[in-house]
Amino acid sequence: MGGSHLAGTLLQSMDEKIFIHHDYDTPRLPSEILEKSIFVLVSYSGNTEEVLHTFQALQSTSYPVAAITTGGELLKLAQVNEVPHIVLPNTGIQPRAALGYQLRAITHLLKHPTYDILGTLTSQEALSFEAQGANLAEQCLNKTPLICSSGENRGLAYYWKITLNETGKVPAFFNTFPECNHNELSGFNTGTNFNTPGSYHAIYLVDDTDHARIQKRMHISQQVLEEKDVTSSTLKLTGSSKIEKLLTACHIAQWCALHIAEQTQADPEAVPLIETFKRKLND
């Protein structure tokens, strides 16, 4: 849940066999699929309610289970029940900022080929990432960001959305092509009560491996929405591998969100509303 599933969500865009469960209990999938599955429970804090509930539900099954966490109740349960687990470094950072740790852990646990690629990546272009993020943040000033991507890059668009929410402290939304052409465009007709001209900024995550028709849809949608006063930016994914493209774009998202937080003098680390909600949930 939250920042703890982001690594899995990014991997899902490269591996269709990965399924992300965002709920309580075990996934509602056919038994023949469940019986061939490995359940990897990830909670950075180790105290995520939904993850702990699913762990307990899985104990009454014979399905193979593993856990990834920094500690908390999940680590205790894994140790008591002799469940294979990986303990992440507890550096005090937010789960969304621990993407690298979680990617290494999950790919190692699953013996995923991405694990070896991760070890070869460098941060030589980090300064250019910050500049790109700062530029996008400037264009989003006083506007609600709308993140747009292909369906294949849905996980990346979602990463952008939650990073802008949690680090940037702004509302942000995402959608994918071609689906958004069948509904979301209608929300920007002039004269609607919900549309304030000039109050949105769309960021298009463009991958040169996207289907040609998807790329055309993005381009036309960008033109149509600009006529409705929706400003926009295009971020072209770069890298020699899929995972490098994803992580580069994630890096830029972090810088964008950080600069947005600075614009409003918000604390990029703290998540007070989420913490307040959790306290009320436990009352």
Please give the residue ranges for each predicted region:
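A generic structural motif
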Residues: 21-26, 68, 170-181, 231-240
